[in-house]
Structures are given as C-alpha cells and as structure tokens.
Amino acid sequence: MGCASEIQAEIFTSFGQLFYASFQTILFLATIIGSLLAIFELCKKTTVPDSTRVLLIGSLFFANAHEFAYFTAPLKVFQLNIFNTNTSCYPLISTRDCIPTTTVLAMGISGNMLIQSALSIDRLLATIFPFSYSRMRALPGFVLLIMVLIPAMFTYSWIRLDIVLDDYQMFCSQWSANISTRANTFLEICSYLTVAHIIINCLIILRNRAIEKRCRFDVTQRYLTSENLKTTQAICYLSIAQFLAMFMYSGGVLLMRKNRENIPTLIYFNVIVWVYAPPYACVSLAPLILFSLWNLKKQRHIQIKSVQSAQKETQDDYIRKLQKSWK
C-alpha cells in the first residue's frame, strides 16, 4: 500500500472533492429510488411490448451496477476526511485490488451502451416482423439482454488483457494508467455507438410512418405500426438523452486523457470528475422511462377518444341519412 503524494492528499481533502462526493451521493440515491419506481411501473400492464420492457429493466440494472461501483469513490472521500486519523498518509489503492470494482464499473458503462443497441434491434424486429414479434412476447428481449450481458461482463477483462496492473491510484473508479490506450479506444467506440443509435432509431421512425400511411385501411397492421411508432419514438428520446450524456463523457474524458500531460494534476482531477457523465445518464434513465410510459399512456387515451368520437359522428351521419330516406 502506497501513500498519496502531497498533491493527491490535497485532492483528497479539497472542498471540491467533498462537494462532488456529496453531489454523487444524491445522484446515487436518486438512481436507486427512481429505478425502483420505474421497475414498478414497467411491471404493470402497459402499452410497452414485453420484449422492450425486459430491455428497459436491463438498462436500469446496468445503470445501478455502475452507480454502486462508482459510489466507492465518494465513500472513500468521506472516509479519509472524517475517519482518517493518520493525516501524514492517505492510502492509495492497488489497481489489482480494484479489479472487482472496476469490472462492475466497466460492465455498467458498456452495458448501458450495448443495451441501446439491443433496443434499436428490438424496434427493428418490431418494424420488419410485427406479427411474429407480437407473438414472441418477451423472448426477443431476453435473448438480446443475454447477448448484451456477456460482452458487458468481460469488457474490463478485454481492456486489461496482457497488461500488468502494478500501479496505485486514489480511487477504484479511476482506471490504471497502464491501460490508457485501450481505455481511449473503448471511449472512441462508445462515441461511435451513440451516434449510430440515434441514426438507426430515426430511420426506424421514418420507416414506421411510411408503413402507417400505406396500411391506412388495414386496421390490425395500422394498430401494430402505430404502437410500434410510439414506442420507437420513446426509445429514440431515451437514446438522445443517453447520447448527450455519453457523448459528453466519451468526448470530454477522451480529450482530457489525451492531454493529461499538459494539465496540472490538481486541476485535472477536480475537473475530470465533472466531465465523467455516466452518473448523469444513470440518474436520468429512470425519470425518462417514467415520462415515456406516462406519455405513451396519454397518447393512447387521446387516440381512443378520437376513434370513439369519429365512430359517434359516423353513426349520427348514418341515422340522418336514414331519416332523410324515409321522408
């Protein structure tokens, strides 16, 4: 176990770190509470397809996995500022000892990215094979979730493959300097994926609108297309929100990591924690899901009322025509 340098000790005890730790504690609790509320609503009977529901619950799992792993950093800040009696030595952590925590952290980040890909594929299946998709219920979601879970679990194993972890760091939420090249590659892949998710979902929305216009007189097909369009739009809004947070993370952190040598250590660590955006993506996920469910329910009620109103007008017109014919 090594001791922190003078600058690192200053970072540990700075007001900025204490404020950030308190802020992250609020985000951590908000993520857990929001996720429980979102899961409760998703478990109710909603217009969201079962397959999509499984993937949304999976996204909440990855968000909470990330937050539990990342919360080790605020805990250490509180511990060193409140309970540490030996101010001459602020202990650093071996990157090897951090492997379990960093593995969960990387799983949360990559899982949140890959689950967006799974949601896009799920919407694509619902668009191309609407009848088969509705009959399979939750099966596509479970298959896609497993396909996401496996690579997400091994993300950090791939990043640290063939690299010796023999250095020390302040927090387990910081990745070893020995894997900086692969970590930068990982961030670049995240950037490309976020852009791809937005493009794919926008194309699916356009495709569903075109299908809806073509099948104007096919009631069953039009209903499935309309429901798919609403769900895809909701998923697209989720993807855009996640995109903004992850783009800030992947772009901002990547920029700072590549210019780390030109940035003073104290400034670097006090700034990069705010650029690290996955906690913002995690805490925003549950409210966005709750809002999407509320919006879908509202749109469906409006659609039902408009149909009922149209039917009533048609019946009245028909009766008037009969009355005129009897005269």
Swiss-Prot record:
Write down the membrane topology. Multi-pass membrane protein
Topological domain spans for side Cytoplasmic: 40-53, 120-138, 207-234, 292-327
What's a single GO BP term from this record?
detection of chemical stimulus involved in sensory perception
Q: Which Pfam families does the record match to this protein?
A: 7TM_GPCR_Sra (PF02117)
Where does this polypeptide localize? Membrane
Tissue expr: Expressed in neurons RIF/RIG and PVT.
Q: Please give the positions of the paired cysteines in each disulfide bond.
A: none
One GO cellular-component annotation of the UniProt record comes to: membrane
List the stretches on the Extracellular face of the membrane: 1-18, 75-98, 160-185, 256-270
Q: Identify the stretch annotated as signal peptide in this record.
A: none
Tell me which InterPro entries the record gives.
7TM_GPCR_serpentine_rcpt_Sra (IPR000344), Nematode_rcpt-like_serp_alpha (IPR051080)
Q: Which residues cross the membrane?
A: 19-39, 54-74, 99-119, 139-159, 186-206, 235-255, 271-291
| One MF annotation (Gene Ontology) recorded for this entry | olfactory receptor activity
Keywords tagged on the record: Membrane, Transmembrane, Transmembrane helix
Query: Family assignment?
Result: Belongs to the nematode receptor-like protein sra family.
Protein known as: Serpentine receptor class alpha-12
